[in-house]
Amino acid sequence: MGRVGVLLLNLGGPDKLEDVAPFLFNLFSDPEIIRLPFRWLQKPLAWFIASRRTKTSQENYKQIGGGSPLRRITEAQGEALKEQLHYLGQEANIYVGMRYWHPYTEEAIALLTQDNLDNLVILPLYPQFSISTSGSSFRLLERLWQEDPKLQRLEYTVIPSWYKEPGYLQAMAELIRQEIEQFPHPDQVHVFFSAHGVPKSYVEEAGDPYQQEIEECTALIMQTLNRPNPHTLAYQSRVGPVEWLQPYTEDALKELGAQGVKDLVVVPISFVSEHIETLQEIDIEYREIAEEAGIHNFRRVPAPNTHPVFIRALADLVIDALNKPSFKLSQAAQIKKMVKMYPPESWEWGMTSSAEVWNGRIAMLGFIALIIELVTGQGLLHMIGLLQ
């Protein structure tokens, strides 16, 4: 089989407070994060949003030590995976490629091309596929492959999603069981799955399979857990005025509190590493909301991180991928051709659902332009005298 490499893909996060602003700019510059009909608007809007959010985001990072632990944990996962693969008889070089911060995916690609690999397994550290996570990284990699003849000669395969992997389900079930057993009455504990949300339009318009995979994953984990505990699935981290997948985590917590739930354990289902969404958003913000709602016993299941069962699951995924027919980036970037890119092939005008979507987007852009002009004091309306 020759020299084997494994490329671990993840989001990335600011290592220190000074990194927050450029990290946010990179994040919102991605058209898979904010989908606009005109690409030339992407970077100006990203700059505006990043400028407005930097201070608040820095305050949040201060609460968890001044930076994200994501890089450190991901690199530890890579080392543990390398050791596990060695134990199973498969030698491999491990590379970490982050989408929005160092080490960037491009940096990882530069390293692996220098190592003259014969086979590469591309493994996103997102159990469930979404156009805004794995899909974004796959599209970037697809472009890099198209631009580099050396990459085109490399044998590779992609693991698009792996939420059904038995070892992953077992690791999650073990982590949940450990937390539940800390309560005085374990069978009464409400298991609360909190997944990172995405705009509803991603699912309904673009065909993102994320919601379906999250729901299936939740059911499989509960089946593996094999306990009578009630459970809820909700979505966190909503940003902006558009509708995201519901129920929202904060609303679901309030509703459970109103129903009299006192014991609750939160499961961060779409996260395999601790980072801002677990350490700050769940542990601090959502804990406060839950306690105010009357949920007095609030615990959180830790992310899998380097849990041995989880690392073994990743190793099994790699070995299985090496022994199966290859799955290419062109396939992974468009899972079953369900995921569409904007703009669509042709514009539609009139009272159709597609036209209404586009009319709404144009109205949204006009609103954004107005807000930017009001904040900056510069723009067309000031030039023609309608605003002073």
Swiss-Prot record:
Catalyzed chemical reaction(s): heme b + 2 H(+) = protoporphyrin IX + Fe(2+)
Gene Ontology biological process: heme biosynthetic process
Protein residues bound to Fe cation: H196, E277
Subcellular location: Cytoplasm
Gene Ontology molecular function: ferrochelatase activity; metal ion binding
Function: Catalyzes the ferrous insertion into protoporphyrin IX.
Protein name: Ferrochelatase
Organism of this sequence: Nostoc sp. (strain PCC 7120 / SAG 25.82 / UTEX 2576)
Gene (UniProt): hemH
